[in-house]
Amino acid sequence: MIGQVLSNDDWNRYKKEGFLVTKFGSLIDYVINWARSGSLWPMTFGLACCAVEMMHTASSRYDLDRYGIMFRASPRQADVMIVAGTLTNKMAAALRKVYDQMADPKYVVSMGSCANGGGYYHYSYSVVRGCDRIVPVDIYVPGCPPTAEALLYGMLCLQNKIKRTQNI
């Protein structure tokens, strides 16, 4: 069908069946998701010892740059937020404010036991029991602190999740 001239009857039939729109829409989705997944720009929100492992992941041994992952300091330039460490009640408002400043589409990676569910400080009165109560989380990376390999695997899972989404 590619390269052929369609008659009006064929065009109306394909248009009614949604063939052209569906195929073109899925191609656009594929290209957009491929570009988004290959150029993730995370912003670090390091609150505790997990941030050290996040820096370790960005170093030359694991080299996130080869996956298209480059850290940004400003939330306006980032599309991924990595929350690493214990989130307190006072810090929750700042986390939400930074999340709201990020450009769409935005993704959140919760790194470590403290960010996932409060961790060791779960029963403290001043600790939020998981950053998913403040912002929507896409990927959870377990561990206390999680290894650099675990964060790298989490980022690769996020890339695969982005590739599977449908935009149109």
Curated annotation (Swiss-Prot):
GO terms for molecular function: 4 iron, 4 sulfur cluster binding; iron ion binding; NADH dehydrogenase (ubiquinone) activity; NADH:ubiquinone reductase (non-electrogenic) activity; quinone binding. Its EC number is 7.1.1.-. Its cofactor is [4Fe-4S] cluster. The keyword Transmembrane does not apply. One of its GO terms (biological process) is aerobic respiration. It catalyses: a quinone + NADH + 5 H(+)(in) = a quinol + NAD(+) + 4 H(+)(out). Its main location: membrane. [4Fe-4S] cluster binds at residues 49-50, 114, 144. It is a peripheral membrane protein. The keyword Membrane applies. Keywords: 4Fe-4S, Cell membrane, Iron, Iron-sulfur, Membrane, Metal-binding, NAD, Quinone, Translocase, Transport, Ubiquinone. GO terms for cellular component: plasma membrane; respiratory chain complex I. Binds 1 [4Fe-4S] cluster. SUPFAM superfamilies: HydA/Nqo6-like. Belongs to the complex I 20 kDa subunit family. This is NADH-quinone oxidoreductase subunit B. It comes from Wolbachia sp. subsp. Brugia malayi (strain TRS). The lineage of its organism: Bacteria, Pseudomonadati, Pseudomonadota, Alphaproteobacteria, Rickettsiales.
